[in-house]
Amino acid sequence: MYSAHCMLPELRLYQLISPSLPVGGFTYSQGLEWAIDKGWVTTATELENWLKSQMLESLTCLELPVLVRIQGYLAANDYAQAQAWCNYLAASRETKELRLEEHQRGIAFVRLLPKLGIALTSELTTMVKTSQLAAFALGINQWQIPLDKALGGYLWSWLENAVVVGIKLVPLGQSAGQQLLMSLAENIPAAVEKALLITDQEVGSFTPAQVMASCRHEHQYTRLFRS
């Protein structure tokens, strides 16, 4: 039997991953702007390879498993462990630019979450400022979003923002961007499945080209995206 109540968590997820969410996700390129400027990424195929590598070697092995742990510890009211994983995520950001993005988006969530009905204690505020993933985890718990759907939604949100960067800078046409989304999104189900199986000892990322590009982007003379 159809139930509007059952649909509400999914609708809340759509809101949480929307590009219109005022937390600045669309203002960062995570090094991609420099990679495009220096000719590392010049075609739709090269962009697809770049994003696929980042998705499978970073988000699947670092962000998603950390999000799973933060969500679980917050649900259990174990704030110490949740904060520890926020700290781990922040420490895993290998450039100043990536650390600032994590912190700045966290601050934006601190302003936003109370307006969406999520109360923040001083402990939770510190957590969210450390890592935006804490804000996402709070949303998952508050709105009872199924974890696998939340992980897929998080990946989709990142992917959509990254493809928009490519559309603007490579540049690519809008249709080519949609084709990229169609192709790359096919990796999301397997990525979520893998992320849910990763042990604590396996959590980490390895994307040296992206890290180098992010370092260089901090000093790029002309930029459209924040550093």
UniProtKB/Swiss-Prot annotation:
Keywords: Chaperone, Cytoplasm, Nickel insertion. It is found in: Cytoplasm. Signal peptide: none annotated. Its main location: cytoplasm. One of its GO terms (cellular component) is cytoplasm. The keyword Chaperone applies. One of its GO terms (molecular function) is nickel cation binding. InterPro entries: UreF, UreF_sf. UreD, UreF and UreG form a complex that acts as a GTP-hydrolysis-dependent molecular chaperone, activating the urease apoprotein by helping to assemble the nickel containing metallocenter of UreC. The UreE protein probably delivers the nickel. Required for maturation of urease via the functional incorporation of the urease nickel metallocenter. Belongs to the UreF family. This is Urease accessory protein UreF. It comes from Shewanella halifaxensis (strain HAW-EB4).
